[in-house]
Design a protein with these regions (language model features):
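Positively charged n-region of N-terminal signal peptides that target proteins for export
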Residues: 1-7
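N-terminal amphipathic/hydrophobic interface segments
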Residues: 19-180
Length: 180
């Protein structure tokens, strides 16, 4: 009985370690620096994780922290087809957090388009959010202006508290303090 319990605990611990490093990176040019455990990937970089596929032209991966710094023509697509595009981003493989810096475009699985800045894509909590202003465009041509937002990925719902302005396809304007 003790042996079975020991084997179970050992198996559980080893399984956790195996799944923590499931990051696959490909590129045309690869430079490895073993002394600091970093790798630099250039030209047509492709990264596959358990939850998304990321492409860019440059990536620097730190094996110790499992953080990837991405630059130039970044596109991240999750399994539900939510797409984020930017020119600078960081992906933390341990926390499953993808965050952009600067101008960012988000296209949701429902084909809504959002232009904003500094967007966080949290795979563990299934949330995309930003504390910066953003503009959401729907399929009918309506525009929603947010001071900040939170998008619940599994429910396809946007939430925001603060000044929210909606301009519909007929150019009517509505203002709200919160939206859900």
């Amino acid at each position: 009985m003790k042996n079975k319990f020991t084997i179970f605990i050992l198996y559980f611990c080893l399984t956790i370690n195996l799944y923590s490093d499931d990051l696959f990176i490909e590129a045309k040019n690869i430079t490895i620096n073993k002394s600091v455990n970093t790798s630099i990937f250039e030209k047509d970089v492709s990264i596959e994780t358990a939850h998304k596929k990321i492409t860019s032209q440059f990536a620097k991966y730190n094996k110790n922290t499992q953080i990837v710094v991405l630059k130039d023509s970044i596109s991240a697509v999750d399994k539900l087809n939510n797409t984020i595009k930017s020119n600078y981003a960081e992906y933390n493989n341990i926390k499953e957090l993808f965050k952009t810096k600067g101008k960012t475009t988000l296209t949701t699985s429902e084909n809504y388009s959002l232009d904003g800045e500094d967007i966080y894509f949290d795979n563990k909590n299934k949330i995309i959010k930003s504390q910066k202003s953003a503009i959401l465009k729907d399929l009918s041509g309506n525009k929603i202006y947010f001071e900040n937002f939170e998008y619940l990925i599994n429910k396809n719902i946007f939430k925001s508290i603060g000044l929210i302005k909606i301009t519909d396809q007929y150019n009517n304007t509505y203002k709200f303090s919160q939206i859900y």
